[in-house]
Amino acid sequence: MAAATDGGGLPLLADKAASHSHHHHPERHFTSGEVVRDVIMGVSDGLTVPFALAAGLSGASAPSSLVLTAGLAEVAAGAISMGLGGYLAAKSEADHYQREMKREQEEIIAVPDTEAAEIGEIMSQYGLEPHEYGPVVDGLRRNPQAWLDFMMRFELGLEKPDPKRAIQSALTIALSYVIGGLVPLLPYMFISTAQNAMLTSVGVTLVALLFFGYIKGRFTGNRPFLSAVQTAIIGALASAAAYGMAKAVQTR
């Protein structure tokens, strides 16, 4: 069905806009995807790895003090390692963006007509005709910086990274890992018997995994309850494997 138009052939959107203002539809978007990804990565590994380590040591009949010492050492090492990994990943992403931007800038200067034609190809993918995107192409050619930004985003699919992203990513992942890693170790700080501490750690950590999985599902758009169950199962399997392996080695 054709849209109603005015004398100039443009769709009449005024009534729609007015109606929309009266029937506002709240859009639920979360734009800080990189931060959420870092937190998920840090907390997820922080909950799982020390949990599995503590279960394995408990299975080997290690005392609570040893489990706690080894667990804290692992949390410190894991936080540093994951933080550095996040820093290097973000730094590599920023370096890649700079290289591609330099190459694209050189192409705009060397072969402007070819690059302008690529704008048209991109626009045509959205259903626009040459007479519709022609003025856009002309406007971008008059503004080299806007042209470069357009090509980076729509041709290469690259967003300009935040200059502080590498440091922020490292700190976010490391801190999240520490927070997650302390959860399964808390019982060992207060319970002297390793077996009792392990059972308490299992209960506390599984609750934390369920809660974290639910929150993760809410932020990532997945089904929260399914995400909670999946996260808890992964943590439980990791700790069970470590505990079983320790018991198997101990009996040899």
Curated annotation (Swiss-Prot):
Tissue-level expression: Highly expressed in leaf blades. Expressed in leaf sheaths.
Q: Where does Fe cation 1 bind?
A: 104, 107, 115, 118, 155
Region annotated Cytoplasmic metal binding domain (MBD) sits at: 92-167
**Compartments where located:** Vacuole membrane
Report keywords, A-Z.
Answer: Ion transport, Iron, Iron transport, Membrane, Metal-binding, Transmembrane, Transmembrane helix, Transport, Vacuole
Q: Give the molecular function GO annotations.
A: iron ion transmembrane transporter activity; manganese ion transmembrane transporter activity; metal ion binding
Its domain of life reads Eukaryota
- Which positions bind Fe cation 2? 104, 115, 118, 151
Q: What happens when the gene is disrupted?
A: No visible phenotype under normal growth conditions, but mutant embryos exhibit higher levels of iron and zinc, and leaf blades of mutant plants show decreased levels of iron and zinc.
Q: Is Coiled coil set as a keyword in this record?
A: no
Q: Mind telling me which InterPro entries this protein's record contains? A: Ccc1_fam (IPR008217)
The record's subunit annotation is: Homodimer. The dimeric interaction is mediated by both the transmembrane domains (TMDs) and the cytoplasmic metal binding domain (MBD).
Q: What is known of its domains?
A: The cytoplasmic metal binding domain (MBD) is located between transmembrane 2 (TM2) and transmembrane 3 (TM3).
Additional comment: Can mediate sequestration of iron ions into vacuoles when expressed in the yeast ccc1 mutant. Can mediate zinc ions sequestration into vacuoles when expressed in the yeast zrc1 mutant.
* Task performed by this protein: Vacuolar iron transporter involved in the transfer of iron ions from the cytosol to the vacuole for intracellular iron storage. Vacuolar iron storage is required for seed embryo and seedling development. May be involved in the regulation of iron translocation between flag leaves and seeds. Can transport zinc ions from the cytosol to the vacuole.
> Which named protein is this?
Vacuolar iron transporter 1
Gene name of the record:
VIT1
